[in-house]
Design a protein with these regions (language model features):
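Short beta-strands and strand-coil junctions in structured, solvent-facing domains, enriched
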Residues: 24, 46-47, 69-70, 113
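His/acidic/aromatic-lined binding-pocket segments of jelly-roll/cupin-type domains
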Residues: 15-18, 145-146
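Glycine-rich catalytic cores of cysteine/serine-nucleophile enzymes that process amide/ester linkages
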Residues: 21, 33-60, 66
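Exported/periplasmic cell-wall-interacting domains
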Residues: 72-171
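N-terminal post-signal-peptidase region of extra-cytosolic proteins
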Residues: 1-14, 38-52, 85-90
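Short, conserved beta-turn/loop elements at beta-strand boundaries and strand-helix junctions
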Residues: 30, 67-71
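Extracytoplasmic
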Residues: 11-13, 20-22, 34, 57, ...
Length: 171
C-alpha cells in the first residue's frame, strides 16, 4: 500500500479497508480477500476535524480490541460494558446510535491528517463497533464511527489484533 511506504512502516498481516462511497469494509489477510462487510460511516460529510462528527480518512491502526468475551448486543459506554443488551435498554436510549458488541479502537497514523492537533482520530474516540441499528447498515448513519452488524464485529474482532492497519478511503 502506497501510504504505508510513504510513512515507512511495515504492512500488517491483516488490512481493513473502509470505502465511504460504497459503505463497505473489506478484510484482507496477507494481500488476499477474506470477507466483505456491509458498514455505515458518518451521516455527516467525512472529516478528520474534531467535533465534525465526520468519519476520518487515511491510514489508521487498531490500537485496542475491547469487549472480547462480552455477549452479542452488549452496550458500551466509555468503552466499558454497562450490563445491558441494546434490546433491553429504555426506548429513548435505543433511539441513539449505541456502541455494541465489540470496539476496535483506532489511532491515526498520518500526522496532520488524522493524528495530532484538532485532527486526531484517537482523541476523537472514533471506533469500529457494532450497532443497535443494523437496519441502517449500507448507508451513512453514524456520528463518525464505522459501524458493523453485531455478529460481524464479533467475528472481525476475533480475527484481527491490535496493530492491524485500517485504511479509510473516500472512494
Amino acid at each position: 500500500m502506497k501510504v504505508v511506504e510513504q510513512l515507512k512502516i511495515e504492512e500488517t498481516q491483516d488490512l481493513l479497508i473502509v470505502s465511504v462511497k460504497q459503505q463497505r469494509l473489506y478484510h484482507q489477510k496477507e494481500g488476499k480477500s477474506v470477507k466483505t462487510y456491509v458498514a455505515s460511516t458518518s451521516l455527516k460529510a467525512p472529516s478528520c476535524k474534531e467535533d465534525s462528527l465526520g468519519t476520518p480518512w487515511g491510514l489508521h491502526e487498531v490500537c485496542e480490541v475491547i469487549g472480547v468475551g462480552q455477549p452479542l448486543g452488549m452496550v458500551f459506554q466509555g468503552r466499558k460494558p454497562i450490563g445491558l443488551h441494546h434490546w433491553d435498554c429504555e426506548e429513548d436510549m435505543q433511539q441513539k446510535n449505541l456502541i455494541t458488541s465489540r470496539i476496535l479502537r483506532l489511532t491515526g497514523l498520518q500526522e496532520g491528517l488524522n493524528r495530532g492537533g484538532d485532527q486526531d482520530t484517537f482523541k476523537r474516540f472514533v471506533y469500529l463497533h457494532g450497532t443497535n441499528h443494523e437496519d441502517r447498515l449500507g448507508r451513512p448513519a453514524s456520528s463518525g464511527c464505522i459501524q458493523l452488524g453485531n455478529q460481524e464485529v464479533i467475528d472481525l474482532a476475533n480475527q484481527v489484533s491490535s496493530g492491524s492497519h485500517l485504511f479509510i478511503s473516500l472512494n
